[in-house]
Amino acid sequence: MSQRKRYSLNVVTSPSIPSPTPSAPIRTNESNWEAASPASAASSFLPNVHHGGTVLNPGLGIMRSPSLNKSGAFGRSGSSGSSTVIEPSNIKLLLIGDANVGKTAMILSYCRELLTRAEMSRSARLRHQQQQQHKDLGLKKTVVNHRLSMKEKRKRYSSNDFEKEFKDINHFADETSDFGNPNIGDDNNHEMADPNEIVIETRSTIGIDIKTNLVNIDNRFFNVILWDTAGQERYQNAIIPSLYKKTNAVILTYDITNAKSFQSCMERWIVQALENFSSQDLLKARFFLVGNKIDLYKERQVTHYDVVQMVQEMQLKHGIKISGNFEVSCKWVNVVERTMNMIILDLVENGCFENNDPCVSITTSDDVQGHEQEFHDTVEEPFNFTRQRQHQLEKNNTVDITKPNDDIANNQSICCV
């Protein structure tokens, strides 16, 4: 055997040249999260399922924060440089109402899980390209297999057999070319539709569906938990006991094109909520009224006067104050998002959330107004900062013989001058 030279895979380097090391650790800030997030390029709230990395309504002070780990805990660095893991505070939103009023679509729109027509068109074209590649690959395999079979049976084939095989191949090509074409079945109305309009394709909720979203309000994290309930009566008995426990906001949802769903909020859903709320949970709960499908305003059956009248009836009959009433459309971008942000800010300002940070005390807007009133009461009386300087009277050393001497009363001896 001939001897072969063996080569080493290790590269020889000079010991005087150290290997390059980074001078400082690489830090990732929110701008990098936004640039790396695919949601910021495809949306005007986010494409993430539950968490995102873009700013929501900077005027409201709410920002969606990217998840740093699976548990959802975030680290806050102190002045000493050490970081402590603090769980975000929980805010539970419960959406109740009749079936087909759009509760599921509202939650998916807030979590940005609904696609627009432009995004649907891009995904359909991508799907069509992939199917076209599979089709071309399938045709090549079919032609190769056909040629192999022809070589094996060429002495048995006639002209009629060749014509039949040729027709079968053309029929297969026509079927695969039509499959997955995004232009087939589209109407002219779809071509004239708004590309930014959201396409709603949801199904009826069975039981309960829960979505979570992490938001940042003034550098404090809140875990927003949205509970989607079924509107059918057959699912109510199983979910009522644990439905209203630790609920911070009850969102009464109705369809503006369906007057019956609006009346159900007064006759059924608000009564059910008051019967199942505990006295302790009711103190930290607020009620909101949200009308959906305002894009169908021409078919409106619920007017603004009806809404104001129902709010007054709820307060007189049940003693419940409606903290806000809104009208939204899940087909319009950012409408549901702004409404949910206003509800969340109202809950935070009034201390209606589960505080998981023991170092932070809950201060509501009522407490702030009370402190301001006490301050104004104390300031009503003006302070007198003028000080009068009093001079100490010095005792005169001279003696007036015409007046009695005070030292005699003190049993002190005196001498006549």
Swiss-Prot record:
Residues 1-34 are annotated as: Disordered. InterPro entries: P-loop_NTPase, Rab, Small_GTP-bd, Small_GTPase. It comes from Saccharomyces cerevisiae (strain ATCC 204508 / S288c). Involved in the positive control of both endoplasmic reticulum (ER) and mitochondrion inheritance during cell divison. Required for the MYO2-dependent retention of newly inherited mitochondria at the bud tip in developing daughter cells. Keywords: Endoplasmic reticulum, GTP-binding, Lipoprotein, Membrane, Nucleotide-binding, Prenylation. Pfam families: Ras (PF00071). GO terms for biological process: endoplasmic reticulum inheritance; Golgi distribution to daughter cells; Golgi inheritance; intracellular distribution of mitochondria; intracellular protein transport; lipid droplet organization; mitochondrion inheritance; mitochondrion localization. The gene is YPT11. It is a lipid-anchor. SUPFAM superfamilies: P-loop containing nucleoside triphosphate hydrolases. One of its GO terms (molecular function) is GTPase activity. It comes from the Eukaryota. This is GTP-binding protein YPT11. Belongs to the small GTPase superfamily. Rab family. Its main location: endoplasmic reticulum. NCBIfam families: small_GTP.
